[in-house]
Amino acid sequence: YPDALMQFEQTYPGARVLLMEENYRSTPEILRAADAFIRKNHHRRPKTIHPTRASGAAVRVIYAMDRADQYPWLVNMAASVQEETAVLYRNNDSALPLIDLLDRGGIPYRCRRMDDAFFTHRIVADIRDIIALAHDQTDAEVFLRIYYKVGGGISKKAAEYACQKSRATGGSILRELLGFPQLSQYGRDSAAALLTMLPMLLQDTAAQGLSRIWDGLRYRDYAERQKLDGGKYEILCLLARQETGLEGLCRRLDELQALVSAPSLPCGGGLILSTVHSSKGLEYDTVYLLDVLDGILPAVTEPKNAGQQDQYQEERRLFYVAVTRARNRLYLFACRNRESAFADELRRELPREYIGPEDVFASLNTEPCGKHYRHAEKGGGVIRACCRGQCMVAYASGETEFLTLGQMVDRRAVAWRAPDRPAPAALPREQAALPPSGVRPGQRAVHRVFGPGTVLSFRDPIVEIRFPAKGDKKFVLSDSVQRGLLRLEE
């Protein structure tokens, strides 16, 4: 594609090349960032994009703790969207957790019909098979599909033997497997681990169960050996956050597959979900860029050969397309625990607000993402995402709330602490003893706090003293004297 443009004059001698350098779509703020990004591409004609529109809103970065925090932010935006707004992403997989939340919340959106490639992918199918085997350990068809993918040391002969014995006895295939005479110790350990962990999957939450399959049953090892797309597992984990168990997750996968494969997806409202490829040639008032993360967009971050270099340059052009779909407003996420080469590069091209050291906002000009916040009624929480004075707070109860900084100040829990006061000086040690003549009414006394007074009475161990400024007080005489609080005069 670039070669055809770069070699146009050689292909068509005498041809005239016209550069389209005026942009009528986007604001100068969006074009300035986009042009600075694409200028770093190799193998392109030197040109500069000139905006024709007046200045508009600044490009905004939404800071988030991790990938999962993008989705509730977008759902909150979608609930009140009033103009045509597009969420653009590289792969359809990225949209599934968002579609799940929008559907649960009854929020309208528009989206092209998707294929069901995610739902039929080997990782998704294998994990569902493992869940099915946990429910029915006599299912020979499922067992023969997955026995060599979890653990190891189980031969095909051993697996078929166990299935045959199970059909005859009606017992667990795994228990019958342990009776295979030629089963190695490694295979025996794998079968025992499956026997132990499969029932646990039925008690786990959906998130715990996926983790147990991936790491506990070592399905991750198989997926990596086969070079399968681990991103499918990550999407499953994002979907699992909304489910209490693996059975519910499987039901929801069936529902989502039917939803995205339907001839016409839900429509209405101003929210549009689209891949970047499908958005070419289109434009939207506002654009949110989802999953601009290394390994997704760009898929290749450190090209090692000419083929990967060409792919990387094409990824940069695709990101440029995504950025320039926005007419008026552009938002992109920056996730703290995920690298994003493209988002970081674009951010470096954005103008930075200057705040002088004496400005009242200087103390607020720090990134609050990840900070703790305590609400007066809802208790402690963590700021999971933020953008330009708006914060997404996740509380320990599981509730997520969107607050401005002003609202956070008004609603925060305040802990009060008494001021520190220096302890009164103790009486000199030589004065901290009872007088040799004992204690008698009318005797003069000096208290470290209440000052001078007169003894009214003494009934061991209690002495009662009258202080002109404080009235009558009673003390345990020996304790007060030993601590240096009270001195009796002769």
Please name every model-derived segment.
Residues 1-3, 23-27, 56, 67, ...:
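Conserved nucleotide-binding/hydrolysis micro-motifs of P-loop NTPases
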Residues 12, 55-56, 79-207, 220-224:
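ATPase/helicase motor core of nucleic-acid motors
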Residues 38-47, 170-171, 206, 244-248:
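Proline-centered turn/helix-capping motifs that create local helix->coil transitions or kinks
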Residues 180-278, 282-286, 296-299, 327-333, ...:
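Accessory C-terminal helicase-associated subdomains
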Residues 286, 292-399, 403-405, 413-460, ...:
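C-terminal accessory regions
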Residues 402-414, 478-488:
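Structured surface patches comprising rigid loops and adjacent beta-strands/short helices at the edges
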